Amino acid sequence: MGFRRPTADEGRLLLELARIAGINHPEKWLDALNVREMTDGGMGSLQLSVTEQDKPRLGSVLSKASVQFADEDGVQVVATLYAGEHEVPFELDVWKVDFSPLRRIPTTFRRIEG
């Protein structure tokens, strides 16, 4: 599957994580961002790209920001924004603790300090 624009729900989550991570001009970053779904059983993880040529980078991987929320079925979900060695975000990892598909991204999130 190719890259696409984030949905409104994905955009809301990505913008929250970008703000926590201290990304300069997070709204502009989001406007330029394209995403591609990852094979994760439907939990919602995304590969991130500002240009079609962006590729995940090998080397150091940094967790830039994480939030937690409950899916509409009550199961806890952790969403983490990862960046490569040049601090360019390349992945949104979404982990639903029971590994079931994500039903809905909520409107509020709880920041995970770390």
Named regions from a protein language model:
Residues D71-G114:
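Short, compact, well-ordered microdomains
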